[in-house]
């Protein structure tokens, strides 16, 4: 049996439900969701679970929902007048402790989103994210190294690019991070949302946001440089301990998503419980 055929309870017997999902009601304004996402994007929760008036999950709101709608409505009206229920992604993946890893990852591939919810013993839901699966990667046994992972082009941006160009590139290339050209720094949906919330007052005093050049108050984050010889378990352990997991070699960048997809390999063994 390969690692991909093991169930979530076999892979994470002690910690599967240890991360409660974070919820927000559908009638809350978007600025509330954006403020919450500043703290949760790229964490073990990563997205907000949207609930109805009966507190039942109806979908998700994450970084992509915010930046996509900013691109379409780059004004404070989006944050102050729009409700979370109007931008929710209703394609919510629900799993159980008996779901195997392959089934989970195939669902993530179909939705282009590494996030699921799982019922817990407290009557609520726990979050299962790409960040969570780094724990699985850290405990696997394999000779797979970073150099064995699929090649993907580094998507970059330049100093004179506008925020409109940057956000459009994220959406076009289905990525949440762009590398600053010829550097080891990056911008992400989290950084954009954090800047809008904390520095630009949810665009209440800002006009023509999409025409803003990349400059202050936007601040970049650093990518950690690693060797191509780093194996999958070591990479997982490294990312697991990072606040914002993102690493690069001379020619490639890698996120927890890449680790998750590598776990589908038949060349990985795992001591299941």
Each model region followed by its residue ranges:
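A structural signal for short beta-strand/turn segments enriched in small hydrophobics and glycine
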Residues: 55, 122-123
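Amphipathic alpha-helical protein-interaction segments
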Residues: 114-117, 126-128
């Amino acid at each position: 049996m390969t690692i991909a055929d093991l169930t979530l309870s076999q892979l994470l017997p002690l910690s599967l439900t240890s991360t409660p999902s974070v919820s927000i009601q559908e009638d809350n304004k978007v600025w509330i969701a954006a403020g919450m996402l500043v703290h949760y994007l790229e964490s073990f929760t990563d997205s907000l679970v949207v609930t109805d008036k009966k507190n039942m999950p109806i979908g998700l709101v994450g970084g992509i929902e915010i930046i996509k709608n900013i691109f379409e409505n780059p004004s404070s009206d989006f944050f102050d007048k729009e409700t979370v229920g109007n931008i929710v992604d209703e394609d919510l993946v629900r799993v159980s402790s008996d779901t195997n890893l392959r089934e989970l990852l195939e669902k993530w591939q179909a939705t282009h989103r590494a996030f699921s919810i799982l019922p817990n013993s407290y009557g609520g839901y726990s979050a299962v994210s790409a960040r969570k699966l780094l724990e699985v990667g850290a405990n696997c046994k394999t000779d797979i190294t970073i150099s064995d992972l699929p090649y993907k082009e580094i998507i970059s941006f330049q100093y004179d690019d506008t925020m409109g160009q940057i956000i459009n590139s994220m959406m076009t290339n289905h990525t949440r991070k762009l590398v600053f050209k010829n550097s080891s720094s990056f911008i992400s949906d989290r950084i954009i949302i954090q800047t809008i919330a904390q520095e630009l007052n949810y665009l209440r005093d800002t006009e023509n946001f999409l025409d803003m050049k990349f400059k202050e108050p936007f601040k970049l984050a650093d990518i950690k440089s690693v060797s191509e010889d780093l194996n999958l378990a070591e990479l997982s352990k490294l990312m697991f301990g990072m606040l914002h997991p993102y690493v690069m070699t001379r020619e490639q960048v890698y996120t927890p998503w890449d680790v998750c997809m590598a776990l589908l390999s038949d060349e990985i063994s795992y001591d299941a419980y």
